Curated annotation (Swiss-Prot):
Homodimer. GO terms for cellular component: cytoplasm. This is 2-isopropylmalate synthase. Its cofactor is Mn(2+). Its main location: cytoplasm. Its EC number is 2.3.3.13. NCBIfam families: leuA_bact, PRK00915.1-3, PRK00915.1-5. It is found in: Cytoplasm. Residues 391-509 are annotated as: Regulatory domain. GO terms for biological process: L-leucine biosynthetic process. Mn(2+) binds at D14, H202, H204, N238.
Amino acid sequence: MSSHIQIFDTTLRDGEQTPGVNFTFDERLRIALQLEKWGVDVIEAGFPASSTGSFKSVQAIAQTLTTTAVCGLARCKKSDIDAVYEATKDAAKPVVHVFIATSPIHLEHKLKMSQEDVLASIKEHVTYAKQLFDVVQFSPEDATRTELPFLVKCVQTAVDAGATVINIPDTVGYSYHDEYAHIFKTLTESATSSNEIIYSAHCHDDLGMAVSNSLAAIEGGARRIEGTVNGIGERAGNAALEEVALALYVRNDHYGAQTALNLEETKKTSDLISRYAGIRVPRNKAIVGQNAFSHESGIHQDGVLKHRETYEIMTPQLVGVSMTELPLGKLSGKHAFSEKLKALGYDIDKEAQIDLFKQFKAIADKKKSVSDRDIHAIIQGSEHEHQALYKLETLQLQYVSSGLQSAVVVVKDKEGHIYQDSSIGTGSIVAIYNAVDRIFQKETELIDYRINSVTEGTDAQAEVHVNLLIEGKTVNGFGIDHDILQASCKAYVEAHAKFAAENVEKVGN
């Protein structure tokens, strides 16, 4: 019988530390709901003491989820722990995650503390946290560069003070398979407690070993894995949870352990994070990449046609990828469209379907067939526009002279107010973005601009991601349209709308 490996998702906390990623309040809530549907055991919803926005989003998630534990991060500071308590007290299963650095380099250069000071702080703050929470998780930051005897002391101190979960972070992705497994074996054999202690692994991917090290931790005695969807996170990212989960599933003969994830929700969860983070999943990404179940070689294709297991160790359907796609066309009606939405796993009310069907027909008039990926894109684009404070109404372009283009942009807010401005620029994109900047009266710096095609062919929809720097803050925007310039404008407007929305939240505080 397989043992249960808990999944601790930190996409909303560590994942959001990815450069250029800044989830909105609504996006955080939608992500949390999808993570619960995916079946993760714990969601680290944020760092409540870091900002009012983080506190409110953690609080909203705690009040919304019904089965998943909601965790908040806290330094060894009572005010941090209090903030987590206030934010998560309405959760079905509230958890506090207390941490302090323990490696020599952190003690000397960051904390300016001795080992004795650190041990005293662990005892004081874990004891305090235990008075407020049934479940207290403790992490010795930079554990893999901490002397092992001192690490054992830190863990024992935390356990004695009431911690029931001990997380061992490979904070800078420094460790390797055997070393990391040895740390867990040492801790499980050395630290003693009358209560059951869950050991957890948290790996970064600086050397490309986050998933491998996470699996090594299980071999060493870990019963919880921390990570993010698609492996997003600071620097090179975190362990990709979908890869850990499928490795355990496929190689259960070796690990003898399984997660409780609803694996069929894996691809949908990955796509959601990719969309909101503005980070496209590489085509060759394990488990969720577009090429994960593609076979280019003639020998491979022949083998798969004869027997799928010749070159596939798991089925696409296992992770929610449909391989029996029936495209729709311009003659498809509302009923066929509604049935397609159901088949793709969407539960959308009839009123919303009316607008989606109009968008579908507009695309169907321009394409020979509308694929499942086109349908997903329509829904994604509609969700983005529905959530935004502002959306693109119309865009007009005109060639002026000497390479200059003129753009007239009309934007509408949720109350129906219209905003219009125009500008010129050296090319269509520059003209469009100058006009949008004038509407929002903000100076911006375009950090990143990416175009991807939703499907193959010259008639494919365009998917545009932008990252802007506005008043020192990075925001991302996303736009989908059959026309590249329309998609580019939608993405830029959405980025401005996100910045405006966050400023409205701050004013309301």
